[in-house]
Amino acid sequence: MALLQISEPGMSAAPHRHRLAAGIDLGTTNSLVATVRSGSAACLPDAEGRVTLPSVVRYLENGGIEVGKTALSAQKTDPLNTVSSAKRLIGRTLADLHQNTHYLPYRFGDNQRVIELHTRQGVKTPVEVSAEILKTLKSRAEETLGGDLVGVVITVPAYFDDAQRQATKDAARLAGLNVLRLLNEPTAAAIAYGLDNASEGTFVVYDLGGGTFDVSVLQLTKGLFEVKATGGNSALGGDDFDHRLFCRLLEQNGLSQLNEQDSQLLLSLVRAAKEQLTTQTEARIQATLSDGMPIDTSISRAEFHNLTQHLVMKTLEPVTQALKDAGVGKNEVKGVIMVGGSTRMLHVQQAVATFFGQTPLNNLNPDEVVALGAAIQANVLAGNKTDGEWLLLDVTPLSLGLETYGGLAEKIIPRNSTIPTARAQDFTTFKDGQTAMTIHVVQGERELVSDCRSLAKFTLRGIPPMAAGAARIRVTFQIDADGLLSVSAQEQSTGVQAQIEVKPSYGLDDGAITRMLKDSMDNAAEDMAARARAEAVVEAESLTDAVNAALELDSDLLDAKELQQIRQGIADLQGRLKDGKAEDIRSAVAKLSRSTDNFAAKRMNRNIQRALTGQSVDNI
């Protein structure tokens, strides 16, 4: 029995009219737009028959803007006003790029929150640059299809964080596009291959693009695409292979510093050489620099492979981790899908084939497969698809949680949870009379907040004054289909509420996610010990506060010996808090608790007597 469909909010359910939707692969090097026509997905060409649009934008003196091939051809002569690889900059800060800015031929601004590029038309951000690319693709699609697009699906690397995803949506909004969904690039590839070939089983999507690397382990069955695990590196791609070849060229010719024009010239030449080496055993680089210095260098395929083999091996580290996360052995993988133009490099194909012991799948164009999958997804979300429906389940790559008293990280949504999702958990106050609570949202696998990544903070105010532990605050985490997080907190008795959309103003450092996962495994034992101690400290401080408050009110119930015994227990406990282990602290807590049992009984009797004073038997 086929499942009934429920359209997304704002989507028309009218079945009789085909609604124009498109899939966009917003790439580091090239971008594409595709759509479904007559039941088949296809990339849309420009007026000259080219489906790929170079992701390059040039700002002209007359106020005009060039996008694509014409802009690309001007990189050598007008590097400061010609921006490429904006995808590597979007949603990031200068601090994230500290390792590679020296070979990027741009004039960066000093803004520490958002990357700014100085051009002849003023300051431009990566969001604005990306918007120009999206505008061009939008125009191409609407001219080809003969109508306005109702929406688009835009693909992003699976390892894009909230800031990078939100920045991508901002670029689409500037371009006048309605984003139906952001779709992870490996997932888009799986959609294209799964639907075309009706494949079932466990597949790995190996996606090496111009600026990013992603890997996804997917379980494909009839009607269900489930992402079992993801991994990757948001700062590893074909550009890094170019950079190694670029540095080698500088070394061979005794060059240390170049002006922007010469940098762009040599970068374009090493990219061309890299592409030649996929079909030729040797490539030659010839140029004349602006100072008249001639460059004439040859590089063999073997030399290029040796120069960049460490980058290829670097991609296999997250592949290994993703397989481990999914609980899948290499021998259980039915097929490996190669995505991204950088997978055309022969030593990449050879390394992947050796690792998995099988030839990777490549019957779809690796440059187009992501856009095709996005087009298929857009067609479904626009309400055009009527048969053979399937379900897509994506996952979040890192755990999300919040800080609890004592600096502990409480995980609300574990890593590799299927999204979209929503989860709630109840929390309470730590102090008597507490009327506000700070919600600190964190990301990571470690047990202590200090070892996790801080995402956002907000404050819930208006909590009714109560005894510690009496209030009930429900915190809800929601991740939408684009992987964007919103967090809300509500006090249950009054309904007072606060919430926040998590939009960090900065991205993760290069390889940060991989490091976070590795650190969580390497430090698991130490983290659990630290958490146990922190929990013991919280318990000790709570008991100490309660006993001190009771002594202020009712110490007259105790004789000198009892009072001294309790005060000594408090002192012993405070001493253990300084450098004692978790078991030492808990032992001192138990000792203090036992010493106050008689005191607690006396206080209860007094309170009962106070409650009964002046009451008649009939009223009891």
From Swiss-Prot:
<comment type="similarity">
    <text>Belongs to the heat shock protein 70 family.</text>
</comment>
<dbReference type="GO" id="GO:0051082">
    <property type="term" value="F:unfolded protein binding"/>
</dbReference>
<dbReference type="GO" id="GO:0016226">
    <property type="term" value="P:iron-sulfur cluster assembly"/>
</dbReference>
<dbReference type="InterPro" id="IPR029047">
    <property type="entry name" value="HSP70_peptide-bd_sf"/>
</dbReference>
<dbReference type="GO" id="GO:0140662">
    <property type="term" value="F:ATP-dependent protein folding chaperone"/>
</dbReference>
<dbReference type="Pfam" id="PF00012">
    <property type="entry name" value="HSP70"/>
</dbReference>
<dbReference type="InterPro" id="IPR018181">
    <property type="entry name" value="Heat_shock_70_CS"/>
</dbReference>
<keyword id="KW-0547">Nucleotide-binding</keyword>
<dbReference type="InterPro" id="IPR010236">
    <property type="entry name" value="ISC_FeS_clus_asmbl_HscA"/>
</dbReference>
<protein>
    <recommendedName>
        <fullName>Chaperone protein HscA homolog</fullName>
    </recommendedName>
</protein>
<dbReference type="GO" id="GO:0016887">
    <property type="term" value="F:ATP hydrolysis activity"/>
</dbReference>
<dbReference type="InterPro" id="IPR042039">
    <property type="entry name" value="HscA_NBD"/>
</dbReference>
<dbReference type="InterPro" id="IPR029048">
    <property type="entry name" value="HSP70_C_sf"/>
</dbReference>
<keyword id="KW-0143">Chaperone</keyword>
<dbReference type="InterPro" id="IPR043129">
    <property type="entry name" value="ATPase_NBD"/>
</dbReference>
<dbReference type="GO" id="GO:0005524">
    <property type="term" value="F:ATP binding"/>
</dbReference>
<comment type="function">
    <text>Chaperone involved in the maturation of iron-sulfur cluster-containing proteins. Has a low intrinsic ATPase activity which is markedly stimulated by HscB.</text>
</comment>
<keyword id="KW-0067">ATP-binding</keyword>
<dbReference type="InterPro" id="IPR013126">
    <property type="entry name" value="Hsp_70_fam"/>
</dbReference>
